[in-house]
Amino acid sequence: MSFTLAIVGRPNVGKSTLFNRLVGKRLALVDDQPGVTRDLREGAGRLGDLRFIVVDSAGLEIAEDDSLQGRMRRLTERAVDEADVCLFVIDARVGVTAADEYFADILRRRARHVILAANKAEGRAGEAGAMEAYALGLGEPLRISAEHGEGMDDLYRALVPLAEAFEAQNVQQAPETDVAVEDGDDETEDWRPSESKPLQIAVIGRPNAGKSTLINKILGEDRLLTGPEAGITRDSISVSTNFMGTPVRIFDTAGMRKKARVTDKVEKLSVADGLRAVRFAEVVVVLLDVGIPFEQQDLRIADFAETEGRAVVVAANKWDLEEDKPEKLKELREAFERLLPQLKGAPLVTVSARTGKGLDRLHNAILKAHEVWNRRIPTARLNQWLSTMTEAHPPPAPGGRRIRLRYITQVKTRPPAFVVMATHTDKLPDSYQRYLVNGLRQDFDMPGTPIRLTFRDQGTKNPYKDKASKINQSGALSKHKHRQKPKGS
């Protein structure tokens, strides 16, 4: 059974705590400051045997339309329009407020189904507020405690008949799925994005670089808050969509400021949330403001993504505002190669999140980075390459002891990782390791993706020695048996 449940209500009534309880993870920021959730965020909800999409919304506030709170209210109203069920949460300890009455009227007019929940109703402190909730005209309120899990069985019973009705409706509208795969399909292609396994992308950057605007342009709707206020995205929001034919799940992260400037408690939580989003991503898009590119924080963000082993694409936003584009592009490429040598060759694309120009370039760069991140190179080709590299530039011989690179193999993908069997690995200089990594990038067309290269000291061992010895012994024994004459002949 699948349906969408939107949690709505005033700020600080416990919506995000309830969201976290329903998804079974700490996905939404929770704090006692009002207005911590500023965007819509989705999660996979679970209650008993019910499975559904749960949406955590910004707090409903009466505000002017052009204010930040006004834009938050419009986003929440959109969630109400799109949801199958709205769970309207009030604070039982505070009681029914004028804002509750105002938004209850909106829900009566706009929502398909409304369930009223009086949160924080545990103990006597919430009794009066729970009784007041009857006056909202939305039916009997459920008395719950999102923090302690009380009342979840009542919520389950309220959802079951609705879920069954949605299930009957979905059966009629469901597309064909679980199509059998024919024999002979290439199993090595299973990493390619699909509806069941969308490509996961994190968009990171400094505050107000245009991350939410870019994602809204990809989505074709104002799903995420945008505006002139730096840092209006606080949570790491993930949304699923089809980006030019590619199924993707995109994380819009909170803007990452320098640590010295991160003083607000909630903003510290948001930055940590953004860093977690990088770990969930396959490709990380580092979004720069072309007017002030490659500031110290941009470099730290890109370096963090590389350290985490993610494929990286650098996108310079607000390109529509740049007058001398050829000269600016030349400057960007030079600065990129000089300041981020660890991401040598990573795609650098220019975009305008406002107009949508350059989205095709960004899409192609993301797909290329993802393909390289999943690259698998045959061992035979690697060893031919290693032989060529060592002949062209032999390893040094510190103290007259020659370093021998005997064998290389790929041990991992996502990102590509290689192991070289060698002698005296402790004497191999970093410069020679960089020579090999750069060679792998260039010769196997792996720009930008992190490459992990480790060296395993074999001493004087030859990886083929034991195998060759066994083969020779087996051959000699076989010949000996054939030469033996039967006794008594």
From Swiss-Prot:
**InterPro entries from the xrefs?**
G_ENGA (IPR031166), GTP-bd (IPR006073), GTPase_Der (IPR016484), KH_dom-like (IPR032859), KH_dom-like_a/b (IPR015946), P-loop_NTPase (IPR027417), Small_GTP-bd (IPR005225)
Q: Domain KH-like spans what residues?
A: 375-461
Q: Where is the composition biased (Basic residues)?
A: 478-489
What's its job? Answer: GTPase that plays an essential role in the late steps of ribosome biogenesis.
What residue spans carry the Basic and acidic residues bias annotation?
454-469
Q: Name one GO molecular function term.
A: GTP binding
Q: Which GO terms describe its biological process?
A: ribosome biogenesis
- Which protein family is named in the record? Belongs to the TRAFAC class TrmE-Era-EngA-EngB-Septin-like GTPase superfamily. EngA (Der) GTPase family.
Any idea which positions bind GTP 1? 9-16, 56-60, 119-122
Positions annotated to bind GTP 2: 205-212, 252-256, 317-320
Q: Which organism is it from?
A: Paracoccus denitrificans (strain Pd 1222)
The region called Disordered is annotated at: 454-489
**Segments forming domain EngA-type G:** 3-167, 199-374
Keywords of the record, alphabetical order, are: GTP-binding, Nucleotide-binding, Repeat, Ribosome biogenesis
Q: State the taxonomy lineage.
A: Bacteria, Pseudomonadati, Pseudomonadota, Alphaproteobacteria, Rhodobacterales
Q: Subunit details for this protein?
A: Associates with the 50S ribosomal subunit.
Statement: the UniProt record of this protein carries the keyword GTP-binding: yes
Does Repeat count among this protein's keywords? yes
Q: What is this protein called?
A: GTPase Der
